[in-house]
A protein has these predicted regions:
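Phosphate/pyrophosphate-binding catalytic cores of soluble transferases and nucleic-acid-acting enzymes
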Residues: 1-160
Length: 160
């Protein structure tokens, strides 16, 4: 089963995707001059984190004041945030934008988020916390012993 972004909502969105420094900002400014009710929905997996302004190409405060932006600085770096959660908050943002007669413009470079919005999120089995906790304890133990190659050895066992 897949969590799906409503098709009627998708039809009202514009998508502008590409890597950092591809010209998305300039294209956005050009689009805003032609479609003044555009609001940007960040399609960037790093810009969602508060305090991660350096190295993420997060829009400047000036740009954010000129053009409404959504899904920036929404969680702390230590918090878990899944692609399914991204789709949900993006859907809500789009519904609010469209409700104001705005045009959602998804802009960013995280292909996983783009695919999830366009194609849905596969809902597989839940995480096995017993295994995750055991592996985390092993990694923590290796780190306490300065065993920098522990994880590499574990991967070699699994891959062979």
């Amino acid at each position: 089963m897949q969590q799906q972004f409503p098709i009627d909502l998708l039809k009202q969105c514009i998508f502008l995707a590409g890597p950092t420094a591809a010209g998305k900002t300039e294209t956005t400014v050009s689009l805003v001059s032609r479609i003044p009710n555009i609001e940007i929905v960040s399609l960037d997996s790093m810009c969602i984190y508060r305090g991660m302004d350096i190295g993420t190409a997060k829009p400047s405060r000036e740009m954010q004041l000129q053009i409404p932006h959504h899904l920036l600085d929404i969680i702390e770096p230590h918090e878990e945030f899944s692609v399914a959660e991204y789709v949900e908050v993006a859907r809500k943002a789009c519904e609010e934008i469209v409700g104001r007669d705005g045009v959602p413009l998804f802009s960013g470079g995280t292909g996983l988020y783009l695919r999830a919005v366009l194609r849905g999120v596969f809902e597989g089995p839940p995480a096995n916390w017993e295994i995750r906790n055991r592996l985390q304890a092993q990694a923590d133990d290796a780190a306490s012993r300065d065993d920098h190659f522990f994880l590499m050895r574990q991967l070699e066992k699994v891959d062979s």
